[in-house]
Structure formats: C-alpha cells, structure tokens
Amino acid sequence: MRTVAWTAAVLGVPVPDIYVKSADLLGGIAHLPATDPAVILGKSLLTGRSVPELVFAIGRELACQRLTSRLLTFYPTLPELRALLVAAVAQVVPSSLPSDAILLRDALRPKLQSARLAELESAVAALEERGGRLDLKPWIRAVELTSCRAGLLACGDITTAARMLAVDGRVVGGLSAADRVRDLIPFSISASCAKVRRAIGIGVTPIRGSSPPPALS
C-alpha cells in the first residue's frame, strides 16, 4: 500500500497498519479502534480510482486522526464525545453524571498520571474562565474542514477533492459535501495553500503535473 505510505510521509504523520475489506464503506477508508494506528480500505478505494483521488481520501483520513489523536476513532458521535468531556471534567470538578459518563470517569481515573492530571486541571480552569461551556460541534467541523484541506494539499487538485467529497457519503458535524467544497475553493488559490505545499516539498502545481506517488498496491 505504497500510496498510503507516500501520503503519510507528505503530511508528516506515522504510516498506519493497513487492512482491506472486499465490501465498501463510507468514504472508502476508516481508522480502526486499535492500540496502534490502523486503517481499513474499502472496495471503492481499491479499484477504479486515480492516484490523486486516492491521495485526497487517504490524506483527509490521516490528517483527521492526527488532529484529534484518533479521538474520533473511538468516540465518533457527538453524544460519545460529550460523555467523554463530562467524564474528564469530573476528574477535576466532581459532579453527578449520567450513566455513560460514570463508566468513562471510572475508566479514566487510574490512567491519569500526575502530569496529565495537571494538564487537565489547567484545561478545566480555562474552560471555567470562559463560562464553563464548550460547544463540540464547531470543533468537529473545524477538524473536518482542516482534514479536507490536508487532503487537498496532498493531492493538489481541487476538482479531484470535490469529486471525492461528492461521493463520500458522510455528513460530519452537519457539513455537506457542498459545504466542504465551498471552504476548499478559496483555500486552493490562497497564498497560504501555496506556501504550505512548498514547505512540504510538493510545489504549487497539481500532483499529476509533478512527481506522482506510486499507485496503490
């Protein structure tokens, strides 16, 4: 699976373990809830895709997991994330919790070493200074839009990115494919996009006009 390794190298993230699935799955790729980073590739990415299309899909997924430390792999829905947040805050500020958060609170407690607990206390204090409210939905949206930008940076072609998003089938944080493309279009022609592509060694031309990565194999 050389395309996965190439994309990971471009984005500066670890190369995950790779598994394949004969059936299809949403987005064609997903991280697995395993101890070490691991992805599974579905049928739609294993056949009939160009290299830039593969790079966008893979880059988007790898970036998302790096941004969240794979948090969304283990807690993919808003209710699950909210329960985790409540359980984490309860380590510092004890309070009555719903049953799902109680289980998480008790599981987290023995895993928090003193340094981590100090970081958590600092984060909770900062949250309280802002009124104690944290809206997770904008955070999920920001992660998704940033991940799509990373996929675009790797593949270098806005048309490819738009095409892959159109068939992705996932709605993340309420963002449709059109919402994500509307964010990517101005970014694709921005100075910051060109600067980042130069910094990661790709250049400003579409990937198919420079040195392409190897095909998926």
Please annotate each region the language model reported:
Residues 13, 63, 67, 86-94:
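Non-catalytic alpha-helical coupling and interface elements of nucleotide-dependent molecular machines
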